[in-house]
Amino acid sequence: TQYIDIETTVLQAMSYCFYEILDNVLTHSSKELGTIITHYDPQNHILSFLVGDDGIGIQASLSENKQYTTITEPEALSICIKDTVTDGKGMGFGLYSTSLLARNAGLRFEIRSGKYTMKVQNDNIEFTTKLDYWQGTIVYLQLHTNKEINPSEVVANRTNVIAQYNETFLNDNEL
């Protein structure tokens, strides 16, 4: 078995964000299942993962909130990574914290829904349009696995993500 050589601070932040992305499938897509694909490049220390579903998509999900009933698909993509943007079923923190992880340790962060893909690098947002329609949502993230980050910044200091990770994944004698 090959183990991924990954900086603990990246794991601590990634575990929180990965859970949030998976929870988005169950909470917001109107589907019970999604798909996860991962790839690790040990030579370049890059972990890639994709989470996809064939649910209602980001625009339809956000439009369940009265505040976003007239939102367009590109607008939905651009605001879904902002803090507290939600369809009313969540806190609006999962994709926001994932965007912070991408800023701290990421190479690529993309969200696809409907006919649009949004690529986020640093503070630049780029849209690709005229794509074939994707029923649902795809979240794709590439991370540096050898870069030390501050996991608390990824969650905007709202939760003790380090303690959560350690309690969930480490034995007491490993601390």
Could you say what each language-model-derived stretch is?
Residues 1-19:
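Conserved short strand/loop->alpha-helix "switch" segment adjacent to the catalytic nucleotide/phosphoryl-transfer site
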Residues 16-19, 100-102, 161-163:
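Amphipathic alpha-helical surface "interface" segments used
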Residues 20, 24-25:
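Catalytic glutamate of the conserved HExxH
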Residues 26-149:
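Conserved beta-strand-loop-beta-strand hairpin that lines the nucleotide-binding pocket
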Residues 140-175:
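N-terminal assembly/transducer modules of large multi-domain enzymes
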